[in-house]
Each structure stands twice: as C-alpha cells, then as structure tokens.
C-alpha cells in the first residue's frame, strides 16, 4: 500500500530530509507503508553529489548539500515537490534506470493531461519541453536509494518564480533553460494537479 501526504505549508529542507530518512528506515523494516509526499519548499538551492562550485552564479538563496543524485537545482513556492519513498525490492524492480524511466513516463503522462508535450532524454535526466524552439526543463529529478528504498524525487515547475533560477546553472547544463506549466500557458491549482498525479501514478506504479 502507498500512502499519500500533502503538506500545504512550506517545508524546511533539512526537516524534509530527516523525515524521509526516518520513513525509509521504517519502510525497510516493514513497519510503515510506502509514501508519496507532495509539498513545497521556501526558496533555496540544493547541491547534489555531482555539484560543483562553478554552477553557482549568484547565491540568492541558502544552499543545502544533499545526498541525492545530480548537481544544483532550485526549489521554491509554486513548484510541486514530489518525494517518493518506494520499496523497489518488494516491487521486484531493483533497477535504477527502470525506476527513472517509470518516473519519466509518469510525469510525461501527467503533463499530457494539460496538453503539454513532455519528453525524456537519455543524456539529460528530467522532463523537457520545446518552448519557442528552445529545449527547456520543466521537471527535475534527483533520487537516492537505500537498501532499494527510494527517497528524494521530482520537482515539477507549476508556477514558480523562474527568475530564481538565475543564481545557478540548473543541473550544470549550459545552454538549456527552465520553464513552467504557467509559462506554457497552463494555470492549474496544485490541488487539481495533485489529483492527476495520484491518478496517473497507479497506471505506472
């Protein structure tokens, strides 16, 4: 069984990581159900295990070092953070590449419900859209596994302040931009998006 939790207040990043680490231990011990946690953070940058100082352009917000994969990214209001704590071993899916592909299919299917064509790129993790002839990232992935239980997850840009990205080179990728559902002409309340996320989740997972 997969539990769903929606936090309406902004969640401190370190508190979120601590909560995830406690939860995945419980899942591994079979003392808790899997969890999909939907939330938002206050404005901040996170630095994954591949992050380098060269990707910091201007320190507009606090930077948190984190154990997830990837480089620097931004989190803030208007972005739907999706933290997934899933037991891949119990699901007989002990394959990180397959997990990333499943996450990608899920978010692509969600975007399709809003007439947004999201695409997966083998060499650039995340979900991409073509906006006025330019490839831009609309969803960033950063995952970690412990004993085949996943944590961290996805940041989907719904209506964030995109100017907040100017302090970093997102995911260390030069020459690519970021976009949001709002910039693509789709204005959707988070509550409506959450319903679609849940519905489409069970088609993949």
Swiss-Prot record:
Pathway as given in its UniProt record: Protein modification; protein lipoylation via endogenous pathway; protein N(6)-(lipoyl)lysine from octanoyl-[acyl-carrier-protein]: step 1/2
Binding locations of substrate: 68-75, 140-142, 153-155
Pfam families registered for this protein in UniProt: LplA-B_cat (PF21948)
Entry's Gene Ontology BP terms: protein modification process
Subcellular localization, as worded in the UniProt entry: Cytoplasm
Ranges that cross the membrane: none
Domain annotation BPL/LPL catalytic: ranges: 30-205
InterPro entries given in the database record: aa-tRNA-synth_II/BPL/LPL, BPL_LPL_catalytic, Octanoyltransferase, Octanoyltransferase_CS
GO cellular component, one term: cytoplasm
Family matches, as Gene3D superfamilies: Bira Bifunctional Protein, Domain 2 (3.30.930.10)
Catalysed conversion reaction: octanoyl-[ACP] + L-lysyl-[protein] = N(6)-octanoyl-L-lysyl-[protein] + holo-[ACP] + H(+)
A molecular function GO annotation: lipoyl(octanoyl) transferase activity
Keywords: Acyltransferase, Cytoplasm, Transferase
Assigned protein family: Belongs to the LipB family.
Additional information: In the reaction, the free carboxyl group of octanoic acid is attached via an amide linkage to the epsilon-amino group of a specific lysine residue of lipoyl domains of lipoate-dependent enzymes.
Primary role: Catalyzes the transfer of endogenously produced octanoic acid from octanoyl-acyl-carrier-protein onto the lipoyl domains of lipoate-dependent enzymes. Lipoyl-ACP can also act as a substrate although octanoyl-ACP is likely to be the physiological substrate.
Protein name: Octanoyltransferase
Annotated organism of origin: Wolbachia pipientis wMel
Lineage: Bacteria, Pseudomonadati, Pseudomonadota, Alphaproteobacteria, Rickettsiales
